[in-house]
């Protein structure tokens, strides 16, 4: 690892904490691909520390800059604040790509669970709004449906650590207007 730095990204709802990872070695020459990373959280828990090792591995293994985004969490920050943070962070990466040492033509988004939802939203919004160009999505067990009326919810409701009841709780905190 060449270096790791914490940074605050300007956002619609205030600063967004981020951690930026730069790789070391021969692949670190020239403009590098950039991966905007959204950690898993159920929209409620965890932060930059929870995916520190994952981000390091992605950075070193892929030879890319990783910008890990600590988006706002529910219940204090309900939808759409986390999606606003994800969009603002991605746009900031594009606007500051050269300064970071990145290649604006090789921007990817990545997310785990709730972070996968945010990565999906960013990619869809970029497509609808005509940019920024997202060349790749790495979605790891993304939350893509907010309804629990599916065969998957019934079939895997219990016994897999993340239960249907816990998912309902996360989504209720994220979407409920109370």
Q: Residue ranges of each PLM-predicted region?
A:
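Alpha/beta-hydrolase superfamily serine-hydrolase fold, recognizing
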Residues: 3-178
């Amino acid at each position: 690892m060449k270096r790791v730095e914490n940074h605050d990204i300007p956002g619609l709802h205030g600063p967004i904490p981020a951690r930026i990872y730069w790789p070391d070695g021969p692949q670190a020459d020239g403009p590098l691909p950039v991966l905007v990373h959204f950690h898993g959280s159920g929209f409620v828990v965890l932060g930059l520390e929870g995916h520190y090792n994952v981000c390091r591995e992605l950075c070193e293994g892929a030879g890319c800059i990783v910008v890990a985004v600590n988006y706002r969490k529910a219940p204090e920050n309900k939808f759409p604040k986390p999606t606003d943070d994800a969009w603002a962070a991605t746009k900031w990466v594009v606007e500051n790509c050269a300064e970071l040492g990145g290649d604006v033509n090789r921007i990817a988004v990545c997310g785990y669970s709730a972070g996968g939802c945010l990565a999906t939203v960013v990619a869809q919004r970029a497509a609808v709004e005509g940019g920024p160009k997202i060349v790749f999505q790495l979605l790891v067990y993304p939350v893509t449906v907010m309804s629990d009326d599916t065969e998957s919810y019934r079939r895997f409701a219990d016994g897999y650590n993340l239960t249907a009841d816990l998912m309902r709780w996360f989504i209720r905190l994220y979407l409920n207007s109370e």
